[in-house]
Amino acid sequence: MGLSGKNVVFVGGLGFIGYEACKQIMTKNVASFFVFDVLENAENIKALQAINPKTKVYYTKFDITNKASIKSAFADVIAKVQYIDVLVNGAGILTDPNVELTMNINLIGLINTTLEAIPLMDKNKKGRGGLIVNIASVLGLEPAPPAAIYCASKFGVMGFSRSISDPYYYNLTGIAVATFCPGLTETPLKNNIATKYTFEYSKVIGDKLNNTKTQKPEACGAHLAQVLDTAENGGIYISNQGTLSKVTPTVYWQPTFN
């Protein structure tokens, strides 16, 4: 759809991959750019604004686990610019011992954010259609024995995104939904990784996974910005070791109608 002239909302835009993507987005002549994050980083917001002074950058303190915070943040966007054209759901954590928090941020929060945005973007209601990109992971496509809870949350993102990208919904609302799956990337998610595994037994296989080849957040962020510019409804995109590719999931079952 292209980003030029669009109003963009980025949830979790001050994280490593998110921030690198935000820097790329600011070169695309977007109309306005809203960054939702739980922690404010005034220096990063100022740096984003400096990339393109013509694009107004807004920061909103945002708690993705709180429905009131979600509703308030989106209402503020509509009050300021009337329309949302692009939503990026990029908030995420890796901490398997805290099952509830992992699910609340990685999956439930993402679902609630999406469901809040859809009526505002729906061309038959208050919006003019647009694009939602949900950030999952390659561990939403393949199992991750050392991080089973994180993996489950990302599989949930994948299932949710694929379901709401059904052409039936797209044709009604004009909202395309795509999924972006980073491979292993050098971010703070890897910090103190031994404390984040599912079981104490997970350390051996977890440390082995943690020592595999990674990519820089700059490369992953650039890929995400590219997807935002070119994504197709239902598209699933992997950013891994500096390469961006589109994947077609295997179909294991289809309903047989009477």
Curated annotation (Swiss-Prot):
Listed transmembrane segments: none
SUPFAM superfamilies (UniProt xref): NAD(P)-binding Rossmann-fold domains
Keyword Oxidoreductase carried by entry: yes
Catalytic class of the enzyme: oxidoreductase
PROSITE patterns: ADH_SHORT
Catalytic activity, EC: 1.1.1.1
Residues reported in the UniProt entry to bind substrate: 137
Residues the record marks as active site: 150 (proton acceptor)
Reaction(s) catalysed (UniProt annotation): a primary alcohol + NAD(+) = an aldehyde + NADH + H(+); a secondary alcohol + NAD(+) = a ketone + NADH + H(+)
Record GO terms (molecular function): alcohol dehydrogenase (NAD+) activity
Keywords recorded for this protein, A-Z: NAD, Oxidoreductase
UniProt binding sites for NAD(+): 9-33
Cysteines engaged in disulfide bonds, as pairs: none
Cellular component GO terms, alphabetical: cytoplasm
Top-rank taxon, per record: Eukaryota
UniProt-listed Pfam families: adh_short
Gene3D superfamilies given in the database record: NAD(P)-binding Rossmann-like Domain
Subunit-level organization: Homodimer.
Family that this chain belongs to: Belongs to the short-chain dehydrogenases/reductases (SDR) family.
Name of the protein described by the UniProt record: Alcohol dehydrogenase
The organism of origin for this protein: Bactrocera oleae
Recorded name of the encoding gene: ADH
